[in-house]
């Protein structure tokens, strides 16, 4: 099988790409910060440049104004010159003008010639200059005006202000400029000349402008002006600490107002540029260089770089801090994302890959075939070796059918018989694999299972046949055993009703006991067989648990008295008066437990305690017998198990009684438990659910309230039960210790009273008393310990109180025996067995009934046609015409007389079949005289009522 490509490499690459993404994000933030800072820097540079330009405009205006003054003065000077003599002709002079001061500029300068030759002109010009000074010089801020002759090289100084002049410095500067001017090319000699000399303090100097004066196209003189220049006037008011420097055409500093650390020198980068803005070498200063036309001078404004960055320094720090924090955050986020996403994902991928490989190895080594088929065409995409082998075993038709089933998606499995007779079961589920609709198929070789199912089916058929044979065996055995046994028990029962010679009655009793034991053994075996074959059914109906317990104790009390034991029956007041269940099976279970208790108890007593336990009715049977070892308690309810090898083996039994009890209680939705200790006795507890329980009204006997009863009872359990029962009836209960009673008091005791009781009566509970309470002498009553719950009824009789009870089980039975008067009833006995037919006739005769007999169903119909019959008592299984067909024929004839079936069949369906055929009831053989009496009394009363109506 091919393994899927690992995607751990993809996850690792994704992890590194995530790191790269974090780095790119950080770089993006950094570039954004740099861009923002650069933009802020450019904005700051733009502001500084704008301020530089505004300041340079002031310097430009200063130069331009001086140039304009030069033009005006030149115009004045040229217009004042006389074209004839080359001197100025004063016009309208009112006073004598002062002669200007003359200064030689060179060693060969002839100031006397200039003074003599141009005296008149200079005086006229001086007068005009004085006039111009008085009216205009203040506006132009001029210090002096001077005129230099072109031939004599002597300077005539027209001072406009009284300002000290450094003569040597000024003459030296003029000397240098005159030489430069004289040596300049012909084209440049006609232009103006500008220069600045340093002043008395930094930032203050003298600005000189020199222009040629021509007369008749001939250079006659050079006119110049001197003006004080203050660099501080070239700044705009503001907070920017800028420096300013004026350079000549060679880049030499003429005047500067800067700090000592910033000395501006001409930079070749911007010397030839009219305007240049940028940083100096080393990025120490930001400068703006602009020419100052019409002069050849240029002005340079500068500001230190740290001043430029001062306003954005905090922005830079914030940007650096932001980038550091962003980098740390991105790195932390990347690391956290790796630890929480990528690294676990890589671990999961590794585990998933290992799991995938492990699953594939499991699939490859699986004992079944596993494959993936494409849904569209059934092509095998992936499979293990076993599936490949199985698929090759399929025929072409099988593959087509499998493909159709997969495409249809109607079923999830299909059984296929291969060409070599191998049974394959193919189950599948639909899924997606590699972007295709597929079916995951599992192929299992079920040949062994098919063979096993066939074998099991054969075994089931054999078991069903065996069950049918077992049912037939039960029916046959039940009929064949119960039929002769009924003849034995029934005749012995009849024989005991006769007067027998002395000694014969003992033999008859022994025979009756033995036959009863045989009947019990046979009944247990048949019941167990019916339970095992699920033939036994629970028949729920409403019954009184109190009556069932009274009936059980009445049946076993003679046996208990015979063994000189005590049988205490405590029925608590909370026991319901009626509930839904099977009273016959409950009686069978309790009778079995009580019989075992009597059997295994030689001394002491047996206690039957009935009470309500929540939603259950609890029935406890406790004895003081030999007990059961703990190791054998766990097997106590196993079939055919008998306890021990010692004294218990001395008791007869099949070992089926408790097993049957456990099965019956389980069928009634109850449970049974045992608690035993060797030498101390055993206690069996049966619990059945209280279905449809009806409880008595909680009220005492009217008339007994306030009566006093004295208790002198040695048995603690009996004493406690009597005290509770009497107090519930409103009786005052007092322990008797020899006190003097009142005439209305009653003494209740379980021992012989030594002296005469002075009260109303004495009730003695005796273990050997059987039957209803008996008055041996006036005021002296004997009561059975098996029915202490009947004591309130006896007290009502003693106090002559008429008792009304909603529970007849607590009432005292009538002492008068009913006289049998049944000779008005004609009963037809139908049985093919002559002994049983004769026995039934004798039993009916002993009960006072009139009787006719018939051999089978045909004979019975003949008798019915000729005689009046009130009740039909018929066997079920007979030749010619059985009891079922006889009943159906009777109903077809329109006869409504009661038909009672008698059968020896032990199956549960037998009674149901009898009822379905039309019978009113069904009795199981052997039928005792008491059962016949109870049944016929019921139906005879019904017939009499029908006659009367």
From Swiss-Prot:
The Rcs phosphorelay may be activated by RcsF. DjlA, LolA and OmpG might act as a regulator of the phosphorelay. Activity is probably up-regulated by YmgA/AriR, and possibly down-regulated by YcgZ, all 3 are connector proteins providing additional signal input into signaling system. Its main location: membrane. Its EC number is 2.7.13.3. The chain crosses the membrane at residues 20-41, 314-335. Pfam families: HATPase_c, HisKA, RcsC, Response_reg. Residues 42-313 are periplasmic. This is Sensor histidine kinase RcsC. It comes from Escherichia coli (strain K12). The gene is rcsC.
């Amino acid at each position: 099988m091919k393994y899927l490509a690992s995607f751990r490499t993809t996850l690792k690459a994704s992890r590194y790409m995530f790191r790269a993404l974090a780095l790119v994000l950080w770089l993006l933030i950094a570039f954004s910060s740099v861009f923002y800072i650069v933009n802020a820097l450019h904005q700051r540079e733009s502001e500084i440049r704008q301020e530089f330009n505004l300041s340079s405009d002031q310097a430009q205006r200063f130069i331009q104004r001086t140039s304009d003054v030069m033009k005006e003065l030149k115009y004045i000077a040229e217009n004042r010159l006389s074209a004839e003599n080359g001197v100025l002709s004063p016009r309208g002079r009112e006073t004598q003008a002062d002669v200007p001061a003359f200064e030689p500029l060179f060693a060969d300068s002839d100031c006397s010639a200039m003074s003599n030759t141009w005296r008149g002109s200079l005086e006229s010009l001086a007068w005009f200059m004085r006039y111009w000074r008085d009216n205009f010089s203040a506006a132009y801020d001029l210090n002096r005006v001077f005129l230099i002759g072109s031939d004599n090289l002597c300077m005539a100084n027209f001072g406009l202000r009284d300002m000290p002049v450094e003569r040597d410095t000024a003459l030296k500067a003029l000397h240098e400029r005159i030489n430069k001017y004289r040596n300049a090319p012909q084209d440049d000699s006609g232009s103006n000349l500008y220069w600045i000399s340093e002043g008395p303090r930094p930032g203050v100097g003298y600005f000189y402008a020199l222009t040629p004066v021509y007369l008749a196209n001939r250079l006659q003189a050079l006119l110049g002006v001197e003006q004080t220049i203050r660099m501080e006037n070239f700044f705009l008011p503001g907070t920017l600490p800028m420096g300013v420097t004026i350079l000549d055409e060679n880049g030499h500093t003429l005047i500067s107002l800067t700090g000592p650390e910033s000395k501006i020198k001409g930079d070749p980068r911007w010397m030839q540029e009219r305007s240049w803005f940028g940083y100096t070498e080393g990025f120490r200063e930001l400068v703006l260089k602009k020419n100052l036309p019409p002069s050849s001078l240029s002005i340079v404004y500068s500001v230190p770089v740290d001043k430029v960055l001062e306003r954005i320094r905090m922005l830079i720090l914030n940007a650096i801090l932001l980038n550091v924090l962003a980098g740390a955050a991105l790195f932390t986020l990347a690391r956290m994302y790796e630890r929480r996403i990528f690294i676990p994902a890589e671990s999961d991928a590794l585990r998933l890959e290992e799991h995938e490989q492990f699953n594939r190895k499991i699939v490859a080594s699986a004992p079944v075939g596993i494959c993936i088929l494409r849904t569209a065409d059934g092509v095998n995409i992936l499979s293990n070796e076993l599936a490949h082998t199985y698929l090759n075993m399929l025929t072409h038709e099988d593959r087509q059918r499998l493909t159709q089933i997969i495409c249809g998606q109607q079923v999830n499995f299909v059984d296929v018989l291969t060409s070599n007779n191998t049974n394959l079961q193919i189950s599948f589920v639909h899924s997606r694999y590699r972007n295709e609709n597929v079916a995951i198929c599992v192929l299992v070789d079920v040949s062994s299972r098919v063979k096993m199912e066939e074998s099991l089916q054969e075994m089931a058929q054999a078991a069903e046949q065996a069950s049918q044979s077992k049912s037939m065996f039960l029916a046959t055995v039940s009929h064949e055993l119960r039929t002769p046994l009924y003849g034995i028990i029934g005749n012995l029962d009849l024989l005991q009703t006769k007067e027998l010679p002395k000694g014969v009655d003992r033999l008859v009793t022994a025979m009756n006991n033995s036959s009863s034991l045989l009947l019990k053994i046979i009944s247990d075996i048949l019941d167990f067989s019916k339970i095992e074959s699920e033939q036994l059914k629970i028949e729920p109906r409403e019954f009184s648990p109190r009556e069932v317990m009274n009936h059980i104790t009445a049946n076993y009390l003679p046996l208990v008295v015979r063994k000189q034991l005590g049988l205490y029956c405590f029925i608590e007041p909370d026991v319901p008066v009626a509930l839904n269940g099977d009273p016959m099976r409950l009686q069978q279970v309790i009778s079995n437990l009580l019989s075992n208790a009597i059997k295994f108890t030689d001394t002491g007593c047996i206690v039957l305690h009935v009470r309500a336990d929540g939603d259950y009715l609890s029935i406890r049977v406790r004895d003081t017998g030999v007990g059961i070892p703990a190791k054998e308690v766990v097997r106590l309810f196993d079939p055919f198990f008998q306890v021990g090898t010692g004294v218990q083996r001395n008791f007869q039994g099949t070992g089926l009684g408790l097993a049957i009890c456990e099965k019956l209680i389980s069928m009634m939705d109850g449970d049974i438990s045992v608690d035993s200790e060797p030498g101390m006795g055993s206690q069996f507890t049966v619990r059945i659910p209280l279905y449809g329980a009806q409880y008595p009204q909680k009220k005492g006997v009217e008339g007994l309230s306030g009566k006093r009863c004295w208790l002198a009872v040695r048995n603690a359990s009996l004493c406690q039960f009597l005290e509770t029962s009497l107090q519930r009836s409103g009786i005052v209960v007092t322990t008797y210790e020899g006190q003097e009673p009142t005439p209305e008091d009653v003494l209740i005791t379980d021992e012989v009273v030594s002296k005469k009781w002075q009260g109303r009566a004495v009730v003695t509970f005796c273990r050997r008393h059987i039957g209803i309470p008996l008055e041996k002498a006036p005021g002296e009553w004997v009561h059975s310990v098996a029915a202490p719950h009947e004591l309130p009824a006896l007290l009502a009789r003693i106090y002559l109180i008429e008792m009304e009870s909603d529970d007849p089980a607590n009432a005292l039975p009538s002492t008068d025996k009913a006289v049998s008067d049944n000779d008005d009833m004609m009963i037809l006995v139908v049985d093919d067995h002559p002994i049983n037919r004769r026995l039934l006739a004798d039993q009916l005769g002993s009960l006072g009934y009139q009787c006719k007999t018939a051999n089978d169903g045909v004979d019975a119909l003949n008798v019915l046609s000729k005689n009046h019959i009130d009740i039909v008592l018929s066997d079920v299984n007979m030749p010619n015409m059985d009891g079922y067909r006889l009943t159906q024929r009777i109903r077809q004839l329109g006869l409504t007389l009661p038909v009672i079936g008698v059968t020896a069949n032990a199956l549960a369906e037998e009674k149901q079949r009898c009822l379905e055929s039309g019978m009113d009831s069904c009795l199981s053989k052997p039928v005792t005289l008491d059962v016949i009496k109870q049944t016929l009394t019921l139906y005879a009363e019904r017939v009499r009522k029908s006659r009367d109506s």
